[in-house]
């Protein structure tokens, strides 16, 4: 028997194009993406957690959804169904493409030298790239759903689709990535 995500989508055919993110994006076949915190004991164990569960965990960061994992998993499942209907592609592959396109490659850090503080451009680790991408996708979806007729699932689907196409005009996550990289480039 083949295990599919939510019993619908096959994650065996999903490919990660970015070599730096390959070991941090986990698309291992799982029926329901809920590990109950098993991968939080060690610092880099979150790389073993399925990306759909990590997205649901980031959606729970909002004060209204705190602790409502079943609710956020239902939102993510509905968003993946919307993505499949619109793009006619595997929604897990679209999510992987969105993560690759919305994670910044470089950002700035504050360095103090002799009483003078200035910004210095630094490369971003793959783990932080993914964390930032998840945070910006979840934030973009919840912000666009606020005081809007669209549901959070529809807004999340829009955000993931636009981020997978690297659409800077419509995707909050890609816009934030470009902004961070622009600031880092000026701080070189």
UniProtKB/Swiss-Prot annotation:
Descriptive protein name: Small ribosomal subunit protein uS7
InterPro entries found in the cross-reference section: Ribosomal_uS7, Ribosomal_uS7_arc, Ribosomal_uS7_CS, Ribosomal_uS7_dom, Ribosomal_uS7_dom_sf, Ribosomal_uS7_euk/arc
Molecular function as annotated in GO: rRNA binding; structural constituent of ribosome
Q: Biological process GO terms, please?
A: translation
Q: Which NCBIfam families match?
A: PRK04027.1, uS7_euk_arch
Task: Write down the species.
Answer: Methanococcus maripaludis (strain C5 / ATCC BAA-1333)
Name the family.
Belongs to the universal ribosomal protein uS7 family.
Top-rank taxon:
Archaea
The root-end lineage is: Archaea, Methanobacteriati, Methanobacteriota, Methanomada group, Methanococci
């Amino acid at each position: 028997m083949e295990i599919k995500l939510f019993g619908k989508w096959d994650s065996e055919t999903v490919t990660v194009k970015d070599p730096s993110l390959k070991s941090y994006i986990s698309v291992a076949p799982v029926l329901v993406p809920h590990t109950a915190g098993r991968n939080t004991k060690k610092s880099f164990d979150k790389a073993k957690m399925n990306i759909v569960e990590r997205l649901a965990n980031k959606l729970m960061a909002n004060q209204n959804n705190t602790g409502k994992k079943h609710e956020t998993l239902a939102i993510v499942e509905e968003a993946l169904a919307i993505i499949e209907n619109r793009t006619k592609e595997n929604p897990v592959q679209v999510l992987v493409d969105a993560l690759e396109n919305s994670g910044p490659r470089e950002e700035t850090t504050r360095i103090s030298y002799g009483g003078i503080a200035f910004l210095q451009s630094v490369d971003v680790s793959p783990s932080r790239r993914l964390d930032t991408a998840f945070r910006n996708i979840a934030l973009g979806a919840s912000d666009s759903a606020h005081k809007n007729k669209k549901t959070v699932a529809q807004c999340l689907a829009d955000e993931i689709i636009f981020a997978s196409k690297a659409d800077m005009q419509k995707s909050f996550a890609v816009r934030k990535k470009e902004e961070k990289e622009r600031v880092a480039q000026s701080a070189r």
